[in-house]
């Protein structure tokens, strides 16, 4: 589909891309700001020159991707039954605009999956060996905002999410800063084939592997940053750390 879009716009003269939508739309928008892309697959396999020649403005309508502050694009490659990622500075947006009202039309299920994606972005960004004190600040705050937001929704009902949508959208942005600099880990790596082959929504695919990966980390490096993460989550949800 992306290759067909490139064919359609090949002879159109434009100098700005405004991408408004969820993660997939934003990731495609980033690619449309590049010059002379003939094959998405070749682009993602670094077989084509990557040249940015258009202004890029990103406006997310979900609270999960953080794409407005990352240099990452993820696409499904059907011929290989998986997803591939491209991370280059040419994919950074010139401007990112956060408008909570645009997220309020999301169905509840889409909200859950997208916000879980942001939560996992922040968790993996924090646990990444490439994390820094800077990225940890954003990761910790994102985790706190998302989990405390979930608690409010549990207490006041699912429609209450729209009252605090700005909280989730900013948390997604913070998570984007965290993982955009520190990277993600095994949860995302394992989820790509699940999404690429079976079309499982990205947030749901990540969720399927989250606890198994965290338990593996705890078993193999129980004295690492997993302890700090456990303490943070326990303090937010008022649970004992051993739970």
Language-model regions: role of each:
Residues 1-6, 239-243:
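Short, intrinsically disordered, charge-balanced linker/junction segments flanking boundaries
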Residues 2-7, 11-100:
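Glycine/threonine-rich beta-strand-loop-alpha-helix active-site module
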Residues 7, 34, 38, 181, ...:
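Short, well-ordered alpha-helices that flank and scaffold nucleotide-derived cofactor binding pockets
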Residues 28-33, 122-123, 143-149, 172-176, ...:
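Buried hydrophobic packing segments
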Residues 64, 174-203:
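Glycine-rich phosphate/pyrophosphate-binding beta-alpha loops
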Residues 72-182:
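Carboxylate- and glycine-rich phosphate/diphosphate-binding segment that chelates Mg2+/Mn2+
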Residues 197-243:
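Gly/Pro-rich interdomain helix-loop hinge
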């Amino acid at each position: 589909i992306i290759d067909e879009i490139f064919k359609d716009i090949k002879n159109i003269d434009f100098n700005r891309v405004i991408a408004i939508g969820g993660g997939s739309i934003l990731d495609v928008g980033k690619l449309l700001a590049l010059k002379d892309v003939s094959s998405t697959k070749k682009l993602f396999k670094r077989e084509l020159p990557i040249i940015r020649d258009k202004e890029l403005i990103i406006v997310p309508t979900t609270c999960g991707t953080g794409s407005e502050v990352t240099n990452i694009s993820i696409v499904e490659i059907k011929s290989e039954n998986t997803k591939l990622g491209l991370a280059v500075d040419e994919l950074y947006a010139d401007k990112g605009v956060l408008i909570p009202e645009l997220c309020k039309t999301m169905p509840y299920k889409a909200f859950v999956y997208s916000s879980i994606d942001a939560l996992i972005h922040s968790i993996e960004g924090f646990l990444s060996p490439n994390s820094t004190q800077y990225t940890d600040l954003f990761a910790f705050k994102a985790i706190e905002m998302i989990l405390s937001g979930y608690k409010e929704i549990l207490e006041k009902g699912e429609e209450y999410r729209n009252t605090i949508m700005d909280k989730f959208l900013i948390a997604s942005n913070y998570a984007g800063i965290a993982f955009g600099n520190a990277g993600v880990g095994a949860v995302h790596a394992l989820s790509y084939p699940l999404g690429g082959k079976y079309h499982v929504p990205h947030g749901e695919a990540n969720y399927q592997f989250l606890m198994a990966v965290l338990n593996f980390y705890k078993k193999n490096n129980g004295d690492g940053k997993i302890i700090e993460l456990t303490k943070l989550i326990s303090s937010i949800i008022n649970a004992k750390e051993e739970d």
